[in-house]
């Protein structure tokens, strides 16, 4: 049975009925002796023949693979950073206060009221368990906001440090070895 290699996608096509020609975008039963051991996505198709990449082409493939690995790893780090902030909380007086984006926005709004001099006390903020924590005074607010800001900024800083490690990598293997154990 004949098999056809698509010139652009480098994917195999096995027609149910072999007419001997699948069109100009396919190569029928190509000679693959020159690409033995070369990953299929790196094959170079020229006309109706397949060859291994040159040193320069291999370097370009390696650079593209490294860039893709870095982007994937940094996206995973960013997602983990957002997850840590959204799911976790900071403990204040035995209550886990939510550090979600919504909770941060609420504290920012309360800070705006404090700056305008129109804040009233007590104020409630969301707790991680679905309940609430009562802020009884401006000094208590400053303490809670400071604890939350420290948690969020240190979590983001840890993510940035991991991203810097990824950016410094020179091989895909080094990128894969960067571990986000937060």
Q: Model-predicted segments: where are they?
A:
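A preference for well-ordered globular domain cores
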Residues: 2-3, 7-39, 46-182
């Amino acid at each position: 049975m004949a098999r056809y290699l698509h010139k652009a996608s480098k994917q195999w096509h096995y027609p149910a009925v072999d007419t001997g020609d699948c069109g100009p975008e396919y190569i029928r039963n190509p000679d693959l002796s020159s690409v033995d051991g070369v990953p299929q996505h790196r094959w170079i198709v020229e006309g109706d023949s397949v060859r291994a990449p040159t040193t320069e082409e291999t370097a370009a493939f390696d650079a593209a693979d490294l860039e893709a690995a870095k982007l994937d790893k940094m996206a995973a780090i960013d997602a983990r950073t957002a997850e840590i902030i959204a799911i976790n909380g900071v403990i204040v007086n035995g209550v886990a206060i939510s550090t979600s984006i919504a909770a941060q926005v609420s504290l920012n709004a309360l800070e705006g009221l404090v700056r305008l001099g129109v804040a009233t006390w007590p104020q409630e903020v969301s707790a991680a368990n679905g309940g609430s924590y009562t802020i009884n005074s401006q000094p208590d607010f400053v303490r809670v906001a400071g604890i939350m800001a420290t948690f969020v900024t240190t979590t983001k800083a840890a993510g940035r440090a991991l991203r810097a490690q990824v950016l410094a990598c020179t091989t895909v293997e080094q990128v894969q070895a960067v571990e986000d154990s937060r």
